[in-house]
């Protein structure tokens, strides 16, 4: 009896975990895959254009409707974008006026540069709470940054 209850609880936990992982309404991090893409107020070409997003613009997808995705960005703005314009490339935007870039994942590593607020980079690698950033094209690394200083994956 006790083994049956444990088995039922474990099975329920696994099913719920899988439901969360495959639920398209759960937020996932992606980016805009083309330059100057219209972000709209609704899931239609007839919907009002709210703004244009640059290549690599990091977004958190909250839901999908047909060929459209609804997202939220780092300042809390929301909008709809045509799904083929969304990329699975992980990108990040710098959230602070100046973020130190280091040669490795930690404050003990040498300072190699700084990134400024609003700069967008590709996330090349993760190590704990640190992300290795690089340029969108060519994967040339620029340095490691503490993930609390960025919005992205």
Please report, for each region that a protein language model flagged, where it lies by residue.
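Bacterial N-terminal signal peptides that target proteins for export
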Residues: 2-13
């Amino acid at each position: 009896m006790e083994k049956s209850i444990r088995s039922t609880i474990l099975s329920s936990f696994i099913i719920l975990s899988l439901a969360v992982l495959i639920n398209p309404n759960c937020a996932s991090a992606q980016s805009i895959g083309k330059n100057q893409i219209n972000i709209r107020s609704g899931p239609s070409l007839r919907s009002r254009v709210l703004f244009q997003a640059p290549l690599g613009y990091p977004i958190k997808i909250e839901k999908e409707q047909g060929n459209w995705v609804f997202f939220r960005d780092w300042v809390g703005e929301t909008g709809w974008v045509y799904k083929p314009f969304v990329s699975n490339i992980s990108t990040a935007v710098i959230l602070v006026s100046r973020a130190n870039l280091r040669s490795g994942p930690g404050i003990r590593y040498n300072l190699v540069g700084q990134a400024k607020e609003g700069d967008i980079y590709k996330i090349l690698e993760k190590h704990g709470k640190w992300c290795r950033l690089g340029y969108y094209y060519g994967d040339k690394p620029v340095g490691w940054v503490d993930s609390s200083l960025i919005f992205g994956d």
